[in-house]
Amino acid sequence: MSSKEKEQEAEKGKQGWIIPTVIPPEEWSTFRYRGKTLEELLNMPMDEFIKLLPARQRRSLKRGLKPEHRKLLEKIRKAKKLMAQGKKVVIKTHCRDMIILPEMVGLTIHVYNGITYIPVFISPWHIGHYLGEFAITTKIVQHGEPGLKATRSSLHIAAK
């Protein structure tokens, strides 16, 4: 690694957490999940795919899908058929604990964060993660200027 690259990496570190960039579908051919390509994952039976997942996700899927998750998968399959016909479909869900499966790749799913629906474009690199990981529920606190009504304690100070 050259010194220029090291400086760029250090600069990224100073910026804090960086939102991952969306990788275009043309570059998906380089993707591998535990040594398997996206095509292999799509053609793989669910039992074999579950064996590739980390323990937490593997245990969750082995116990079976919740009814809400089944409904979401039905919505996704229906949406894929409609999208093949050229229609635009919005998939909204409250299922933040749904594990991203290979059949979801390429879709934009709107995940509820407690206030609004956050659009999440699913790329192959999201496989095995939870939908809720990509729809942040908290907001970074931005404090106002100090003064009257800036804090709860200043409510009791008489205004001049």
Curated annotation (Swiss-Prot):
Entry-linked InterPro entries: Ribosomal_uS19 (IPR002222), Ribosomal_uS19_CS (IPR020934), Ribosomal_uS19_euk/arc (IPR005713), Ribosomal_uS19_SF (IPR023575)
PROSITE patterns named among the record's database cross-references: RIBOSOMAL_S19
GO biological process: ribosomal small subunit assembly; translation
GO CC annotation, single: cytosolic small ribosomal subunit
Domain of life of the source: Archaea
Physiological role: Protein S19 forms a complex with S13 that binds strongly to the 16S ribosomal RNA.
Protein's name according to its UniProt entry: Small ribosomal subunit protein uS19
